[in-house]
From Swiss-Prot:
Species classification: Eukaryota, Metazoa, Ecdysozoa, Nematoda, Chromadorea
Extracellular side: 89-607
BP GO terms, sorted: sodium ion transmembrane transport
InterPro entries: Deg-1, ENaC, ENaC_CS
Record's protein name: Degenerin del-1
PROSITE patterns per record: ASC
Length: 664
């Protein structure tokens, strides 16, 4: 009995352990399903609970035909949503922008004002420069011919190389051919500007380049070519067989013991550069006249506007080749040009408030308010509170190439380089010219919304050092670099990028041809693309309105120094009155902004997702949690599984020990 009782007790103990172990396996947190089963359960739970309404309806319905219907509807909505997404993305990729206009009611800072005389150099001083004198003489010859040219001659004229032209040594005196009126019984003759029938009937005169006089004159037959022992700096030579050790070609009138330096090319004809008529048709001098005109660069030109334009370009090039101090001495001084000045109702200090700016086209210009550190502003709108100037241009000393009398004005920012030839306004004499200005501050967007240069990214290749970036300065810099690369020298009209660069010789015809050719190439749209000159991101733009009235009036009391008898008429001919002022005490700020930002993109995409899928940002977060959970199940390490099994075994052992203890 006892033995039987012990067997029954052992059997009960074993059954109790199995029941406890089974209960532990059912309730233990360490029990783990297969990863595949866990993923299936995770997907099922997500689909049944998700806020993506189409997915939810597919997995919660029990009818197959309803489930199929929801699948079709969901696919159609997904396609429509993706199509809508593509349109929204295209709109964002276009990087469209809008311009916001803000009107600021306060006094705007006054701009810098650069004023110039339309005539760049004084005529009497410019003619003392041999290069300019030659250019003006050639211009005179071209204008005279244009008044008397015939189409038959023009069609038969071909352009010759400028290398065949004259090459003079620049001295004050030179021999010239002239038609003469000789007094019987005297050797000397009187020079005339008309053309003789032949050179044999002409005289040779000693021509003074400085004052344009031709004296003395002797018959050409009494002059002979010779070799002189010495010539001085102004062109006179010692007669042969006298003091000196040189062998210099010269022209001599031996009867008078008179010799002058012989030019390297042909002797000039006075009727070509001072005469008012060309040689008669059929004369041998007429053909020579036209050949000379072609060599000077005016071949096949009869339009005086075109002739004047070309003469201006030649003169600008030759003047630009002079030393800046010498060039400035040929122009107008500050006190000569600006006679009276007031700003904001107060008298200006002309000596200190105007800064010299030498422009290649207009010579000496003067800039008011050029100091960036000094801020000037008008206290009120209107002419009385702006800049008022009386300028004296002295039109009696104008160059023959200057077509109008008056002044040139450029309105620009204080940190910008003035370009009066490109962005200037002309004001005539005898008129009070009023320029009403308005400021517009422009703020552009950089990449990817626009293409502009930011302020903190200056152009290192700009030749205008110390000035703010401008597209015009960029184009001129690009042109200068191209000229240096192609012609081997720098255009004298613009600054040099490097000190080691040499200026182009304006008297060298090969160099001039290179400047003309390369300048024409750069003017094409295709070549301008290589310059990559873009607008600045921040820019002050001044708009101008112009009005004028006759000046001075008959009742005004004016002083004209030595011309007090008819002062008003004198001022109308030689002076101009200028007014530059703000039209209103406000200015505009134009600011570009994003038309369609990243926030707009997200909002529109969310709206489309909600419309077609019933989804929101919460749905996206929900899906991300599901994806992370599923990925974690699929990528669970094997070591973690082994550790879980070990923990489960330990728990079973602990449970067995617990049962044993309870039985005891």
């Amino acid at each position: 009995m006892a033995r039987k009782y012990i067997d029954i007790l052992k059997k009960s103990k074993m059954m109790l352990f199995q029941d406890v172990g089974k209960s532990f396996e059912d309730d233990s947190p360490c029990k783990e399903e297969a990863p595949k089963t866990q993923i299936q359960h995770s997907v099922r739970d997500f689909c049944e609970q998700t806020t993506f309404h189409g997915v939810n309806m597919i997995f919660t319905t029990s009818l197959y035909w309803v489930r199929f219907l929801w699948v079709v509807v969901s696919l159609v909505c997904i396609c429509l949503c993706m199509y809508s997404f593509s349109h929204v993305k295209d709109k964002y990729d276009r990087k469209e922008k809008i311009v916001n206009v803000e009107l600021v009611f306060e006094s705007a800072p006054f701009p810098a004002i650069t004023v110039c005389n339309l005539n760049p150099f004084k005529n009497h001083l410019a003619r003392s420069v041999p290069e300019i004198s030659e250019t003006l003489d050639a211009f005179h010859q071209a204008v005279v011919y244009s008044n008397d040219a015939t189409m038959d001659e023009l069609s038969g004229r071909g352009r010759r190389s400028l290398n065949d032209g004259p090459s003079f040594k620049y001295l004050q005196y030179e021999p010239v051919y002239s038609d003469c009126s000789c007094v019987p019984g005297r050797q000397e003759c009187i020079a005339q500007t008309s053309a003789p029938r032949t050179l044999e009937n002409a005289c040779i005169c000693n021509y003074d380049r400085h004052d344009g006089s031709a004296w003395p004159c002797y018959s050409a037959q009494t002059w002979e070519k010779s070799i002189c022992p010495e010539c001085n700096d102004i062109g006179f030579c010692n007669v042969p067989n006298t003091t000196g050790s040189g062998n210099i070609p010269c022209y001599c009138q031996l009867e008078m013991g008179y010799c002058v330096f012989q030019p390297e090319s042909r002797v000039r004809r006075i009727w070509e550069f001072q005469g008012n008529k060309i040689p008669e048709k059929g004369s041998p001098l007429r053909k020579e006249y036209m050949e000379q005109l072609t060599q000077l660069g005016y071949g096949n030109m009869t339009d005086q506007v075109a002739i004047t334009t070309q003469a201006k370009e030649k003169m600008i090039l030759k003047m630009s080749g002079l030393h800046p101090q010498r060039r400035a001495a040929l122009g107008y001084g500050k006190s000569e040009l600006i006679k009276m000045c007031s700003f904001n109702g107060q008298q200006c200090n002309i000596d200190t408030e105007f800064k010299l700016h030498i422009d290649p086209s207009f010579g000496n210009c003067y800039t008011f308010n050029a100091n960036p550190e000094k801020k000037l502003a008008s206290s009120r709108a209107g002419p009385s509170y702006g800049l008022r100037l009386m300028m004296f241009v002295n039109s009696s000393d104008y160059l023959p190439t200057t077509e109008a009398t008056g002044v040139r004005i450029a309105i620009h920012g204080k940190e910008e380089c003035p370009f009066p030839d490109t962005f200037g306004y002309s004001a005539p004499t005898g008129v009070i010219s009023s320029f009403g200005i308005s400021l517009r501050n422009i703020n552009r967007l950089p990449q990817p919304y626009g293409n502009c240069l930011q302020k903190d990214n200056p152009q290192s290749r700009s030749i205008y050092k110390g000035y703010k970036y401008e597209p015009e300065g960029c184009f001129r810099s690009c042109y200068q670099y191209r000229i240096i690369a192609k012609c081997g020298c720098a255009d004298p009209r613009y600054p040099k990028p490097w000190k080691r660069s040499a200026w182009c010789d304006s008297t060298n015809t090969t160099t001039l041809n290179c400047l003309t050719t390369e300048g024409a190439k750069l003017s094409t749209k295709e070549n301008q693309k290589h310059c990559k000159c873009i607008q600045p991101c921040q820019q002050d733009q001044y708009t101008t309105t112009y009005s004028a009235a006759k000046w001075p009036s008959g009742s005004i009391q004016t002083s004209c120094d030595n011309h007090s008898k008819d002062c008003n008429s004198y001022l109308r001919e030689h002076a101009a009155m200028i007014e530059i002022y703000y039209e209103q005490m406000s200015y505009e700020i134009l600011r570009e902004s994003e038309s369609y930002s990243w926030f707009n993109l997200m909002a529109d995409m969310g709206g489309q997702a909600g419309l077609f899928l019933g989804a929101s940002i919460m749905s996206v977060i929900e899906f991300l949690f599901f994806a992370v959970r599923t990925l974690g199940i699929a990528c669970k390490p094997r070591r973690w599984r082994q550790k879980t099994e070990l923990l489960r075994a330990e728990e079973l052992n602990d449970a067995e020990k617990g049962v044993s203890t309870n039985n005891n």
